[in-house]
Amino acid sequence: MKKRVYLTYPKEQVKEPLLYQVGKNFAVVTNIRQASVSDKIGLVALELEGEPEEIEKAIQFFIQKGVTVEPI
């Protein structure tokens, strides 16, 4: 299964390797479709591929870290 989402990183999380952590800790493949990152905000269009349960775990991880997740 594939799912595309927009991620909006708050200032506090911009420099954290959250995409790396998701790829390492969950059985999902991440594909950055588009991104714009500054010191104040990070905007990422991301495609997640994997089992639905693993994709949901990855999304919940982002939310717990303060990232806004919106479906595309």
Region spans (language model):
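Long, contiguous binding/interaction regions
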Residues: 1-43, 47-72
